[in-house]
């Protein structure tokens, strides 16, 4: 047994970081890395024992439950015999879970890939922000290394010689780093010396090594930075096979609006640009991953003559606590003018002119200092003067003229109208196009608000379809790299202004606005946006189905489930499918060429799985029209049969849902909404791990029932049963009194936890004024599995 004062296995991420900070060590990295680093430091303090020596408190996944339960009990000796008894019960339960995972520990590369997909999908569904949340600064190994190079951490690691010696002692059979196919628990990832892990990644290329049959060691969790955009698209695609078919969204109410009024145009704006009912104020959506996106919109009318103006006020910088804020500007506004044919990213194209909150003017991605910075409650007046030799665009801040920002040749502009345009990043704005009786600040006498320009001198922006039956949605179907985006680009160019393209590329464009892209690259988080883009895209599709526009869904959409569930949202649209299925030789050439240019971003097992799931659409199901771009239906069907056979031979058989270890756990512990369970001992309460069945009689621990409301802990005698109401402890004395343990309330009477109890640690005082653990659980997002500030998209919100 270890004499280490800290049991690394039982620490949460925040506690691991705290211990590392006390020792002035780097607190960056995955949980396995933090455990590795802390254990090495503890061993060094205790006498320099190797970090991976069995029995020293490191993550030894072998052995029995009793061996694991004994580790780390010395620090709790002062808590009394009753505390030790409870800790043994917890450790024994953890031992059952770990042993259960070890039964399925040996897996091939394909199994490892499948497990990794499940972990990634689970993290996405639980709101994992990949290091972008305050207090959850778990960056990848790449950024951690960068921090160490800059002197921000003194990561202790084994020297190469020591790592090699430890590797030899463990034996070749235990050096495998593939992922286990067993159930993921708190101890699902094991540790390896940092030096050994780096050597494995260098030798293996993709960070994986082949496992031998019977190997019980679990692998190191592969950093997310190893994956490209295609991988996360594939993960999102797989979610549709597990999701229920959604109900068609409620159609937006038709609002009768005076079309002669100059206002923000609900058709000429981004889908995530939330416009108020009076159409004079707006903001960008900020819930979940939308906080990464910039949102823009134009006014309904433009001008090409005279001297006109409008006012814009920054009403709020919307708090986005779930977004990583260090060294990144998360609030920004650009205001100016653009052509109706320009994109919504103001300042990123030709004839798109913007003035930034940072005191910068931008056109065609070229930036230059201009004027001064502005902030909340500042009012910017935008002027356009068409009466001079060149068209002049200028600004004023709170009534103070800032001078001419842009000059445009009239010959180049060719009498095309300019429209008021705004681009927001986590900000809210409001406009005065002339509807106010009195402007925010006085304007020159020779200047006119755009609303007051005669209707015949104004130009109306493009209008969308009047009815849903006139709207069109085109779903692209094909393997990654088959040529879908190429077809979409060509088709959109042939029909300018008609389609809104929904694809990962377009989402990334709205994340990669000029300076923001550079900031993300400088902070080492650029690759994380690749994961966020597919997640945003799913929400975009839900919003799009409620808008009267024409859309192209530029995704793989190879599975029948994805096709059906997405098209079900667009009930009432003209639903079309475009299948891009080239010959196998052509497809291999295209993917090879793409890999040479962009790098290989999709694992081979993922491509094989998509080939096996590829299903051609049918007109009778959810499409009104199907177009085959290359191979026609008969030839494509033959090729798909070949792909399915190839996939079947290369991949292991898939496990059916709701089977395996999870099912056995459910049978043993009654896993349901009232009892989370775990092994033979019922350990859950009402959606919590504090449990109302832990071997004792119902109603004595956790859940709605208070632990101290009866004069007994669990009855008389015994030390825990197997779900039967046998007593666990003596009938008396009473152990909780008026204070309860794991009760429904968070405040009020002194209690041990809160409504959502999910912790193993214990406070300084058991049963009296120990609310810190419950509060920490709220902070760490255990309440309903989400961050307390996470905003989930729903139809009533937007």
From Swiss-Prot:
Residue ranges of coiled coil: 624-651
Binding site for ATP: 478-485
Gene Ontology CC annotations of this record: catalytic step 2 spliceosome; cell surface; centrosome; CRD-mediated mRNA stability complex; cytoplasmic ribonucleoprotein granule; cytosol; dendrite; inactive sex chromosome
Gene3D superfamilies membership: 2.60.120.920, P-loop containing nucleotide triphosphate hydrolases (3.40.50.300), SAP domain (1.10.720.30)
Chain intervals for the UniProt region annotation (RNA-binding RGG-box): 688-713
Covalent link location (Glycyl lysine isopeptide (Lys-Gly) (interchain with G-Cter in SUMO2)): 239, 469, 490, 498, 510, 539, 548, 583, 600, 609, 638, 644, 787
SAP domain boundaries: 8-42
Positions carrying Omega-N-methylarginine: 676, 707, 713
UniProt modified residues of type Phosphotyrosine: 240
Modified residues (Asymmetric dimethylarginine): 689, 694, 701, 707, 713, 728, 735
Subunit structure: Oligomer (via ATPase domain and RNA-binding RGG-box region); oligomerization occurs upon ATP-binding in a chromatin-associated RNAs (caRNAs)- and transcription-dependent manner and is required for chromatin decompaction. ATP hydrolysis is required to cycle from an oligomeric to monomeric state to compact chromatin. Component of the coding region determinant (CRD)-mediated complex, composed of DHX9, HNRNPU, IGF2BP1, SYNCRIP and YBX1. Identified in the spliceosome C complex. Identified in a IGF2BP1-dependent mRNP granule complex containing untranslated mRNAs.
Protein purpose: DNA- and RNA-binding protein involved in several cellular processes such as nuclear chromatin organization, telomere-length regulation, transcription, mRNA alternative splicing and stability, Xist-mediated transcriptional silencing and mitotic cell progression. Plays a role in the regulation of interphase large-scale gene-rich chromatin organization through chromatin-associated RNAs (caRNAs) in a transcription-dependent manner, and thereby maintains genomic stability.
Protein name from the UniProt record: Heterogeneous nuclear ribonucleoprotein U
Species of origin: Rattus norvegicus
Gene: Hnrnpu
């Amino acid at each position: 047994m270890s004499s280490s004062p800290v049991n690394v296995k039982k620490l949460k991420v925040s506690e691991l970081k705290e211990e590392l900070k006390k020792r002035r060590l780097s607190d960056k990295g995955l949980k396995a890395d933090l455990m590795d680093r802390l254990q090495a430091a503890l061993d060094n303090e205790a006498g320099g024992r190797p970090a991976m020596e069995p029995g020293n408190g490191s993550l030894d996944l072998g052995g029995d439950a009793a061996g694991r339960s004994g580790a780390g009990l010395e620090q709790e000796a002062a808590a009394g015999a009753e505390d030790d008894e409870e800790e043994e019960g917890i450790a024994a339960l953890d031992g059952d879970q770990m042993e259960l995972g070890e039964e399925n520990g040996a897996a091939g590369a394909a199994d490892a890939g499948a497990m990794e997909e499940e972990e990634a999908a689970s993290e996405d569904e639980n709101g994992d922000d990949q290091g972008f949340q305050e207090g959850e600064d778990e960056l990848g190994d790449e950024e951690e290394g960068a921090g160490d190079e800059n002197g921000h951490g003194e990561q202790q690691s084994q020297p190469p010689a020591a790592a090699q010696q430890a590797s030899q002692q463990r034996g070749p059979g235990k050096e495998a780093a593939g992922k286990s196919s067993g159930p993921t628990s708190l101890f699902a990832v094991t540790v390896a010396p940092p030096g050994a892990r780096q050597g494995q990644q260098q030798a293996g290329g993709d960070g994986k090594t082949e496992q031998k049959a019977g190997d019980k060691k679990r692998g190191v969790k592969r950093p997310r930075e190893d994956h490209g955009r295609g991988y996360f698209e594939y993960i999102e695609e797989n979610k549709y096979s597990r999701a229920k078919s959604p109900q068609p969204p409620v159609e937006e109410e038709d609002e009768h609006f005076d079309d002669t009024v100059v206002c923000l145009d609900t058709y000429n704006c981004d889908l995530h640009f939330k416009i108020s009912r009076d159409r004079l104020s707006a903001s960008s959506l900020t819930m979940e991953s939308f906080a990464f996106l910039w949102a823009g919109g134009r006014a309904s009318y433009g001008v090409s003559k005279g001297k006109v103006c409008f006012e814009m006020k920054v009403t709020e910088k919307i708090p986005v606590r779930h977004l990583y804020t260090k060294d990144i500007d998360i609030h920004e506004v650009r205001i100016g003018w653009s052509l109706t044919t320009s994109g919504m990213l103001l300042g990123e194209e030709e004839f798109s002119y913007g003035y930034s909150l940072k005191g910068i003017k931008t056109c065609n991605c070229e930036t230059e200092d201009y004027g001064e910075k502005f902030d909340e409650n500042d009012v910017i007046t935008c002027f356009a003067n068409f009466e001079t030799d060149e068209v002049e665009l200028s600004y004023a801040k709170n009534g103070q003229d800032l001078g001419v920002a842009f000059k445009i040749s009239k010959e180049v502009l060719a009498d095309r109208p300019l429209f008021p345009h705004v681009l927001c990043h986590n900000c809210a704005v409001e406009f005065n196009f002339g509807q106010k009786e009195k402007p925010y600040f006085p304007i020159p006498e020779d200047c006119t608000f755009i609303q007051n320009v005669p209707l015949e001198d104004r130009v109306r922006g493009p209008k969308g379809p009047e009815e849903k039956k006139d709207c069109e949605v085109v779903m692209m179907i094909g393997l990654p790299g088959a040529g879908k985006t190429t077809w979409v680009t060509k088709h959109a160019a042939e029909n300018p202004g008609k389609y809104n393209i929904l694809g990962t590329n377009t989402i990334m464009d709205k994340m990669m606005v000029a300076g923001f892209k550079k900031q993300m690259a400088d902070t080492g988080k650029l690759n994380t946006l690749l994961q966020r883009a597919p997640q945003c895209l799913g929400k975009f599709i839900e919003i799009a189905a409620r808008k009267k526009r024409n859309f192209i869904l530029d995704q793989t959409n190879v599975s029948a489930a994805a096709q059906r569930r997405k098209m079900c949202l667009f009930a009432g649209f003209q639903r079309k499918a475009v299948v891009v299925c080239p010959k196998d030789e052509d497809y291999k050439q295209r993917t090879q060429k793409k890999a040479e240019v962009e790098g290989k971003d999709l694992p081979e097992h993922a491509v094989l799985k998509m080939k096996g799931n590829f299903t051609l659409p049918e007109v009778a199901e959810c499409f009104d029209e199907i177009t085959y771009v290359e191979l026609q239906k008969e030839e494509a069907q033959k090729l798909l049969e070949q792909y399915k056979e190839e996939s079947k031979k290369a991949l292991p058989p898939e496990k059916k849902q709701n089977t395996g270890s999870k099912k056995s756990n459910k049978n043993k512990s009654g896993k349901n909404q009232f009892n989370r369970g775990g092994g033979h001992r019922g350990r859950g309460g009402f959606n919590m791990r504090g449990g109302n069945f832990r071997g004792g009689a119902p109603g004595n621990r956790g859940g709605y029932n208070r632990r101290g409301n009866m004069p007994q802990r669990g009855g008389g005698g015994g030390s825990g049963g197997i779900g039967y109401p046998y007593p666990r402890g003596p009938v008396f004395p009473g152990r909780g009194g008026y204070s309860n343990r794991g009760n429904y309330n968070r405040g009020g009477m002194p209690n041990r936890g809160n409504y959502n109890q999910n912790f193993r640690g214990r406070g300084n005082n058991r049963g009296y004024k120990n609310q810190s653990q419950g509060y920490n659980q709220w902070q760490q997002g255990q309440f309903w599995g989400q961050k307390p500030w996470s905003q989930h998209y729903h139809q009533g919100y937007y």
